[in-house]
Amino acid sequence: MLQALLIFVLQIIYVPVLTIRTILLVKNQTRSAAGVGLLEGAIYIISLGIVFQDLSNWMNIVAYIIGFSAGLLLGGYIENKLAIGYITYHVSLLDRCNELVDELRNAGFGVTLFEGEGINSVRYRLDIVAKRSREQELLEIVNRIAPKAFMSSYEIRSFKGGYLTKAMKKRTLMKKKDHAS
């Protein structure tokens, strides 16, 4: 019974670690992923070693399976809380909506405004880049000012140049100055 509990706990730790490692790899953070992979490998070997010692012990096998499933739920929750990376939103508008553009820029979001041809009239599209951790804030601003806007989003794997890169460099330099003081 104690072994089954240990296996369950190890799986609840292992699967979120696996989830985080996978996300780091997808986000091209290979060094961090390698470090997390060390922990993942150790937990994997230990838990499977216990299960394979006695394959007739159904409690250990069930603990492994249920722990894996519970670990998936926990891993998804942790991933949402960490919100690693960046996201881009395309926001389609019927009018130019300078109020929305100004509000988003004042809040620190990178915004580019495009004018395009819709089926019946001119349409406007905003491309907005944000840290995933600020996605909810972004959505609240858009929904408050332009509740009828059409929105779609995707995650960014990498980017180069533009407003965000300059803003991040400024913040990094300011942090270094603050730490030096």
Curated annotation (Swiss-Prot):
Recorded topology in the membrane: Multi-pass membrane protein
Residues that span the membrane, as ranges: 6-26, 32-52, 58-78
Cellular component, GO annotation: plasma membrane
CDD domains named in the record: YitT_C_like_1
Keyword NADP: no
UniProt-annotated location(s): Cell membrane
Record keywords, A-Z: Cell membrane, Membrane, Transmembrane, Transmembrane helix
Family: Belongs to the UPF0316 family.
Protein name according to UniProt: UPF0316 protein Bcer98_2136
Taxonomic lineage: Bacteria, Bacillati, Bacillota, Bacilli, Bacillales
